[in-house]
Amino acid sequence: MGAGVIPFAISDCKVYFLFQTTFTGRKAGHLIDFGGGQDVGEDYRKTAIREFIEETETMYFSDNVRQATRTVERINNQIPIVEALFDATLSINPHWWCRRTPGNPLRPKRWKTFFIEFPFRDIEALNREWEADKAGRFKKRRELVWVAAAELLAIYDKAPEKLWKRVRQLEHAPEIVHAILQHKEP
C-alpha cells in the first residue's frame, strides 16, 4: 500500500501542479508525484503527507531553506501544516484523489494520490539548494517543477511518457485536473 500527493496552487489567476524530477535512477527525467509506501499505522492520507515533507527535505514550508534538514523532529513539526491543507481541500472536494490502476488482479496495486491545494511558493531557492549540495545534506538531488494545468492535460493526452508510471496509471486524473480548473480558475 502507498500514497502520494500532487499539490496544486494558484498564481496569477492560473492553476499550477507541483511535481518533482530526479537526475538518477529509474525515475530520472519524469514528472513524479510526492509519494511512497505506508509506514506502520499510517492510512493513505498520513502516508501522502509524510512523503511530501520527506521528499521536499522539509524545505517547502521552511522559513530558511539553507537551514532545512530532513529530521524526524522537522518532519513532525510540518505534519500539522500539511494536514490542515488536506483537511481544507478534501472537506470541500472529497473526491479530489485517484487510485492507481490495479494492474495484476492477483497482486493489485493499492494506492491513492491526492490533489491538494497548497500555498504557491517560488521553488527556485529550493532547487538551488539541491543543486549546490555537495556534502550529502540531502538524500537525493531533485528539482521541483510547477506545471500549468493546460500543459499537464496536454501531457496526459499527447505525451504521457513524460509522467512517471505511477502518475500515468492514476485513474481519472485528467478529470480531476479539469474539476480543479473549473473550481479554481476565473
Regions found by a protein language model. Name each.
Residues 11, 23, 37-39, 71, ...:
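Short, solvent-exposed coil/turn elements at secondary-structure transition points
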Residues 1-34, 61:
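N-terminal strand-loop-strand
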Residues 33-89:
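The catalytic Nudix box helix
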Residues 13-14, 64, 76-78, 87, ...:
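Intrinsic-disorder/low-complexity loop/linker signature
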Residues 8-11, 53-63, 118-123, 152-155:
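Short regulatory "switch" loops immediately downstream of catalytic or recognition motifs
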Residues 25-30, 90-186:
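Nudix hydrolase/Nudix homology domain
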Residues 3-5, 44, 112, 142:
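Residue-level detector of short, conserved catalytic/binding motifs and their immediate flanks
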